[in-house]
Amino acid sequence: MSFVYQESSFKADAKPERTKLLWVIPWKRKSTAVGYSQALNMTWEDYKDETGNSGASRKNFKDSADFIGWYASKGYYQGFDRLDARSLYLAYHEGYGGFKKKTYRKKPWLIKVADRVQTRSTKYQQQYWGCAKELKKKRFFFF
């Protein structure tokens, strides 16, 4: 959830800003990222191929959340801690190859963003566990 917040602010149609031609005319976008997860075209296609979810849409919240889980699970199998949202986000942004090369070290702004993602992730986790206790209570409903 903290990745979605950071990448798209929970907006289904989020896209990167356009570059400007002659400082005024809207031009091409900086990347092919689209939707809640801001997944790039090639990575999204890999996800659809590997999961068999050929009808997945980056503008669908469920599909985007599943994509982020799929991508993070690749990190888990490479030794990432599942609760280390900071490192997972850096790998999400830079790619696992870029993370291994530590390309993020040349981007202090990205490290700050990853720290915010970790903080938000911890907050969301605490909120979830608070709600989980309430949801597990047995209730009787009368119709």
Where are these regions (language model features)?
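Catalytic glycan-binding domains that act on GlcNAc-containing polysaccharides
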Residues: 1-135
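Low-complexity, Gly/Ser/Thr/Pro-rich intrinsically disordered linker/tail segments
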Residues: 133-143
